[in-house]
Amino acid sequence: MLKMRLLLTWVLLVLPLVNALKCANNRVLRKYHIDKHSAKKSVARDTPPSKTTEKWYVNPCEEHPADDIYDGCDKSDDICGIVMVDLPVFNKDPFVIKRIEATDMASFTATEESNALVLRYTGISWGQNMVAANIRYFCDKNSNEDEITSSIWANNDISIIIKGPSGCKKDSSELEDGDVEESSGLSWFTWLFIYAIFFTVVYLVVTSYTQTRGGSIDDFRHDFVERAKQFFTSLPAFVREVVSKVLGSAPNAAERGGYSAV
């Protein structure tokens, strides 16, 4: 059992970490003023014998400080929703019956519609459920702040509509030629490299665990280290062989391409 815990720990250590969303590096979001604003909404309604309060906070960009966040939310949250119930007859503090948070650990996409900027989060964990959230930003040039005009939480789908400056595109003079064209996160090549290393480590760990199942932790560690050394020592030769075969085939291909029927 202890060795299994060690295996799981090592696997988790190589999982890629995800930073907060930097909107200036997203080819869609960088064209909008979304990095300068957050939006919040608090609505209370009578639900006799109780009073229910629903709060929403939306701040997808790390560039904008989360100074105005609600209690109970985290500053790393892109979206935070809280539903509280107050029972005055019991003279108790309100208690939370619903709470959900979306961070950049969730899958994120940003798209442009004809008159709206759309942010979609999928894979948001809420207990044992997976929730999706759609946020639509509409431009209001007459407003200085974003306003949540609609929020619906039905089953496992959240829909939020925001009107304000965040939905307005920047002027061409505000856009820089050096803006990063790639979407937020790492490039596909970097992710490919990360996952190659990840699955290699998993393979080595599982193989060592299988070979030393009846042994001690020291046996497992020794076997893993030896296998890792052997793998990384032979890796350069393997890469050179692959490169030489690829480059070696190029002249032949060029030579074949040089002949033509007369």
Curated annotation (Swiss-Prot):
This is Autophagy-related protein 27. Keywords: Autophagy, Cytoplasmic vesicle, Disulfide bond, Golgi apparatus, Membrane, Mitochondrion, Protein transport, Signal, Transmembrane, Transmembrane helix, Transport. It comes from Vanderwaltozyma polyspora (strain ATCC 22028 / DSM 70294 / BCRC 21397 / CBS 2163 / NBRC 10782 / NRRL Y-8283 / UCD 57-17). It comes from the Eukaryota. Pfam families: ATG27. Residues 1-20 form the signal peptide. The lineage of its organism: Eukaryota, Fungi, Dikarya, Ascomycota, Saccharomycotina. Residues 21-185 are lumenal. One of its GO terms (cellular component) is vacuolar membrane.
